[in-house]
Amino acid sequence: MLWLVTMGRRLNGVFIAFMIVAFMIGVAGALQAPTLSLFLSREVGAQPFWVGLFYTVNAIAGILVSLGLAKRSDQQGDRKKLIMFCCLMAVGNALLFAFNRHYLTLITCGVMLASLASTAMPQLFALAREYADSSAREVVMFSSIMRAQISVAWVVGPPMAFMLALNYGFTAMYAIAAGIFVISLVLVALWLPSVKRIEQPADIAVTEVSGWGKIGRAHV
């Protein structure tokens, strides 16, 4: 109980906004990742080889795009604007999968949109760390709480994904994911701060929870 009171004093509205956005982006990603292979085999009619190829291309593209955007964001630009851009790409990606069943389109446009969208989470953690540093808050505690939101999202998301996909169809599932990303975009625009860039002495590893559940790094 004492820990909760202490934590409540240390967390302000901006930190709560960070946690809400992290949870919502995590849920939206957890809606898409577990059902991807089922979607490709059932809805698109892809054979096992093409399903595997999709995952391979998606992983390679995700790594390259994430590294490129991370490097650019470290050198210049506003992380908040980049997060908003990634959320917008995530909306486009979810809507593409909701209404398109053409494999070639999905493995090109879909993978590119997903790769751009996947950068949202590591950039969110990087922005949260910069804000915590600038406001003299406990960075480690706050990062741990944010990671807990991701864990909860991945407990809730997969069962919800299969429930929606099997009972209401993949179009409804991806449309709901798109809606969650839209809400996240609005929350980022209204609640999250823009932090003046401060040089950091070391790289900080950050878990990336994308639409497909990849792992990445954000350099802070």
Segments (PLM) and residue ranges:
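Structural signature of the two symmetry-related core transmembrane helices
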Residues: 81-96, 175-178
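Cytoplasmic helix-loop-helix junction between adjacent transmembrane helices
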Residues: 111-148
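Helix-to-loop junctions at the C-terminal end of transmembrane segments
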Residues: 64-78, 165
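Juxtamembrane intracellular "pre-TM" segments in multi-pass secondary transporters
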Residues: 1-15, 191-219
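Symmetry-related core transmembrane helices of the 12-TM Major Facilitator Superfamily/SLC fold
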Residues: 172-190
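Helix-loop junctions at membrane interfaces in 12-TM secondary transporters
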Residues: 13, 98-110
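Residue-level signature of mid-helix packing/kink "hotspots" within the transmembrane helices
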Residues: 59-67, 154-155
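Helix-loop boundary and gating motifs at the non-cytosolic
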Residues: 3-59, 217
